[in-house]
Amino acid sequence: PASHTKMVHGESAAVRFEMPYLFLDRHGNRFMDEGCCRMGYLNEFTKKYLKEVDFADSTAAKFFSIVPMNWEEHYEQWKDFSDISIHNAYRNVDPEAWIKGDTLEELAEGMIAYADEEGWAHDYTVEAIVESINRYNELVTAGNGDEDFGKRDEYMVPIEAPCYAVPRGANNIDALVDG
């Protein structure tokens, strides 16, 4: 077979989750249209975070996907018209590996604890994370589309507690595979 470029990903199979939920950057802020067609551009969207740390710490590009408890229902609705995946090769994602919070504040505290434990370059605060989730939910409730980033309406679903935070990472490097 022909050689091709493949990405070396920044997270394990248990959390490699290609669904368009709310993405929060190293500051706890939403930073992009999370729609499926945008995921391939993560390296471009996260360069500014690497620049903030003078390209000295690749963990500055790490982020969280905030996921509702009923995520599997959305997968069933979206899979027929969208390039989404809950699989990595033969393995499914594992919600047991995700951070769960019964309140948004508890979720934020868990995210901060995880990022600290993993040594991420971040400045998360509970307030910033909760504010970002609340703003996203305001957009969903208003029903006027995503005025902040332009995400497609069908992907605008509420994120209410209890919910999950999935640790994510932008692709680390391009690598040559099979060649």
Regions found by a protein language model. Give the residues of each.
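Residues forming the flavin
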Residues: 1-131, 141-179
